[in-house]
Amino acid sequence: MSQTPDQRILECLENEYPSDLSIEEIAEKTGMHRNTVSKYIWGLEREGKVKISRRVGRAKMYITITE
């Protein structure tokens, strides 16, 4: 069974933890388009599964929220 975009993004961030990633980096690592990553990361942020860890210029860096 294939993973949903949400699952692919979360898995990518979990694999890189404790490092944070930009939308562009997540897109490269998952093979998804950056617009798709942006759409789904926004939803994951609203659900409290990821958060912005810092900003580098205009880019937002994301990290998973561990329990």
Please annotate each region the language model reported:
Residues 25-27:
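A short acidic, leucine-rich amphipathic alpha-helix
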Residues 14-18:
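Short helix-capping/hinge SLiMs at alpha-helix to coil transitions
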Residues 40:
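Residues in the recognition helix of alpha-helical DNA-binding motifs
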Residues 1-6, 20-22, 54-67:
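Short, cationic-aromatic polyanion-contact patches
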Residues 43, 47:
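Alpha-helical DNA-recognition elements
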